[in-house]
Amino acid sequence: MPAMRGLLAPQNTFLDTIATRFDGTHSNFVLGNAQVAGLFPVVYCSDGFCDLTGFSRAEVMQRGCACSFLYGPDTSELVRQQIRKALDEHKEFKAELILYRKSGLPFWCLLDVIPIKNEKGEVALFLVSHKDISETKNRGGPDRWKETGGGRRRYGRARSKGFNANRRRSRAVLYHLSGHLQKQPKGKHKLNKGVFGEKPNLPEYKVAAIRKSPFILLHCGALRATWDGFILLATLYVAVTVPYSVCVSTAREPSAARGPPSVCDLAVEVLFILDIVLNFRTTFVSKSGQVVFAPKSICLHYVTTWFLLDVIAALPFDLLHAFKVNVYFGAHLLKTVRLLRLLRLLPRLDRYSQYSAVVLTLLMAVFALLAHWVACVWFYIGQREIESSESELPEIGWLQELARRLETPYYLVGRRPAGGNSSGQSDNCSSSSEANGTGLELLGGPSLRSAYITSLYFALSSLTSVGFGNVSANTDTEKIFSICTMLIGALMHAVVFGNVTAIIQRMYARRFLYHSRTRDLRDYIRIHRIPKPLKQRMLEYFQATWAVNNGIDTTELLQSLPDELRADIAMHLHKEVLQLPLFEAASRGCLRALSLALRPAFCTPGEYLIHQGDALQALYFVCSGSMEVLKGGTVLAILGKGDLIGCELPRREQVVKANADVKGLTYCVLQCLQLAGLHDSLALYPEFAPRFSRGLRGELSYNLGAGGGSAEVDTSSLSGDNTLMSTLEEKETDGEQGPTVSPAPADEPSSPLLSPGCTSSSSAAKLLSPRRTAPRPRLGGRGRPGRAGALKAEAGPSAPPRALEGLRLPPMPWNVPPDLSPRVVDGIEDGCGSDQPKFSFRVGQSGPECSSSPSPGPESGLLTVPHGPSEARNTDTLDKLRQAVTELSEQVLQMREGLQSLRQAVQLVLAPHREGPCPRASGEGPCPASTSGLLQPLCVDTGASSYCLQPPAGSVLSGTWPHPRPGPPPLMAPWPWGPPASQSSPWPRATAFWTSTSDSEPPASGDLCSEPSTPASPPPSEEGARTGPAEPVSQAEATSTGEPPPGSGGLALPWDPHSLEMVLIGCHGSGTVQWTQEEGTGV
């Protein structure tokens, strides 16, 4: 754990000071806020006050500090006004009055109002203390404190029964927290004296400044840190020189006295002495984390901890030589106690344990220092082995082995006189003392430098390994020390080099994590077979994001921090975005909420940040790099640093789609403001939401949400797939008329049902629609034409549908078999002699005759659908199919002819001869009576509709049908009908008409009459039925004049001996199309 610096943040210790200074006397108090004029609400309530009054803290908080809730009937009104006046004028006030507890019991109270000022000199708080003085007032006072139910006196002194004594914060808890539990009887006496006599100095409600003497050093200050650096160097010097001076001292000097100390030794001793003095004036950190500045507390703390060790280490052994005091060898060993100062370095160096390089350096220094100590001891053992020998020198010591190898052997000589000079052997490891008291002197041996280096080599080889054997232990003492050295070496090797390994791994941890994640990413790409372009994008994005955040997960890192601190960090990280003019009107709380919604984003070159059509979920602020906005390959905008992209603020449930792509040009760093978090923040601060919405429109560099819908409409309108159908739908909606005809698919053929003598109307146009099949009346059984088809066909001009008006065909003659015939479309017949089946529409005037099929092209006026590749390859199959369909059609026609002939015969035999109604043309009289029974109209009752056989009177066909009731005309449909040529005609005249009337809506009797045919007219032949009477009129002239072609009754009716068809007639117009007979169908 790093050393604690202590809690040095400025604090407001007002509450602790109040609890300490006014303990006992002012323990029952409340604090009122003087800034809220008029009310002065209570902001703090002591437990003693709650104990006195019986009110809980929750009941007292935010009430007036005048404590009007304690007033009762005996409370003086004058005192009330004086308290109010003192609070309003921010003055001190003291009074005695009667207050009431929560239980309703009165007590005498000494009330003291004291204003508390802040650092600006303004009154910030009111200290209102309450002291129970009921006992003092009751002594000799009137007897008015008796209870109602008894004669025993009841004093107003509050008891502690029923209350939790641990909650007495003003007297116990706060007093303990302030660190003043020491008994201070004198201080209490002075405070009590000050309450009743002199007033004590009141604390101020402000941040307390650090109170310290100018001669007190802060333990974590710069001056003390510099001094600790000098002490560290001095301690290291002592750790190196003291073992060397003790163990590797020259033995040639006399043992009676030692030489003078060096300058470095004297400087180190002076530093140690000054360090003791400074330690008495240096702050320390208490167990509660507070920094103690009191000199008395500092001295007491230092004396009880490190003082004794520092005094022993600072004994001036070297200074004794300056005062001519001899220091013998035994006393000189006391300098090794200075090595204990190394223990003081551990707490100071612990604060640097977070730096790997510093820890690595310290570990290596410790290992080298231990090796130096082992080398000094090894040299001392070898020296003592030689000096302890008798008359003959030992031959097995490590120094003897070294001397023989270096050819500098040891030898004994007689002791020289005191003033004699050494014979040049002052640099070797010889001893100048007497050998065992024999008067012999040891000389020779290796030099001191060679001996120390060899000893250090042995120490390092023994600590790091088991040694190499070139310097070995020979004597018992040397072997024992070698064993101890190996044990220490094993421990140091594990500790030092284990820590070194951990430190090196920690130094390369980020690099290892990078390679590990890269390897995982490549394995993922290989397993899932990611394509090469996507693989390159993944690797580039990973490398770019790693370069930005160095692999640190900021979300996880900040999650452990409190919300307040995390918001401040987020505001610092996103200050570029929050400094936009868009947020200048936001409060600090709103900015903090918005900063938590911001997320960093990154975009690589060529990467798409947003695709067209994506749902916009955030606003993006470009911090660095450049981007471009694309739409259909066109660059709409280029964005750079400081640009804001996104959309206007949508509603919470609204989804806005992007109208363009946003692509990165370079490596871009962005800040992303999520719309969900933005909505949540604006919901907390609704006053800022309107200004933000208005400002966002002007701050957006490019609005990705503008015109999204119109862009989609434009794109769809350019599509050419459904252009014709879209045009028809528009005309159908707007009610516009035009000659547009929508194409019909091949599987929905339409056949023309109009005869040459009929003209088209809206109903006919609808029947000609390519998506509808012309309805045919079912003649078998009880069937009848569908009512739905009749309703749509006979709607008439009174209620024309808008769709039919838009699809009305232009008037044009059609003198050839129409190409819309089902047989032509299906490929059964060859239209106009053409061998190729085609699907065409006539959009212009055709030629007078269609002897050959016109060539397709723009000038022909035909919309053709050519064969596909598959149809060309299957020509033979289509020919066979066409032939089979033709044969089947012929069989069906023959069967129909037989059924129709049979039906006619049955109806003529079974139907009674009576007058049937006939429609009357406008302006004509009643129908003439029938003169012949065979010429009367024949009515056949089929059970569903009445069918009347009528002569083809021209007035009936050309006239206007009268309608007795307003609205659409009755559902009547005249149909021409001709018998097959194989049967003799049962009719006395050329043609008869079937008139179907609805059972539910019969025609009025006045509008129906019998109109027999003229018996004198001969029956027309087949040729006469086709060409008309002797006065021929060309079909072209009839078409141009709008009148029907001549024939029986003024209308030429089709007559096909091979078939029986029903064609809608009676809807002539002057400008409609004249249809010719289709060969082979009888239409």
UniProtKB/Swiss-Prot annotation:
GO terms for cellular component: membrane; monoatomic ion channel complex; plasma membrane. The lineage of its organism: Eukaryota, Metazoa, Chordata, Craniata, Vertebrata. N-glycosylated. N-glycosylation mediates traffick to the cell membrane but is not necessary for voltage-gated potassium channel activity. A motif (Selectivity filter) lies at residues 465-470. A nucleoside 3',5'-cyclic phosphate binds at residues 582-697. InterPro entries: cNMP-bd_dom (IPR000595), cNMP-bd_dom_sf (IPR018490), Ion_trans_dom (IPR005821), K_chnl_volt-dep_EAG/ELK/ERG (IPR003938), K_chnl_volt-dep_ELK (IPR003950), KCNH_animal-type (IPR050818), PAC (IPR001610), PAS (IPR000014). Residues 137-150 have a biased composition (Basic and acidic residues). The chain crosses the membrane at residues 229-249, 260-280, 303-323, 332-352, 362-382, 480-500. One of its GO terms (molecular function) is inward rectifier potassium channel activity. Belongs to the potassium channel family. H (Eag) (TC 1.A.1.20) subfamily. Kv12.2/KCNH3 sub-subfamily. It comes from Homo sapiens. The keyword Glycoprotein applies. Residues 773-785 have a biased composition (Basic residues). Detected only in brain, in particular in the telencephalon. Detected in the cerebral cortex, occipital pole, frontal and temporal lobe, putamen, amygdala, hippocampus and caudate nucleus. Residues 1-228, 281-302, 353-361, 501-1083 are cytoplasmic. It is found in: Cell membrane. It is a multi-pass membrane protein. Glycans are attached at N421, N428, N436. Residues 250-259, 324-331, 383-453, 475-479 are extracellular. This is Voltage-gated inwardly rectifying potassium channel KCNH3. Residues 93-145 form the PAC domain.
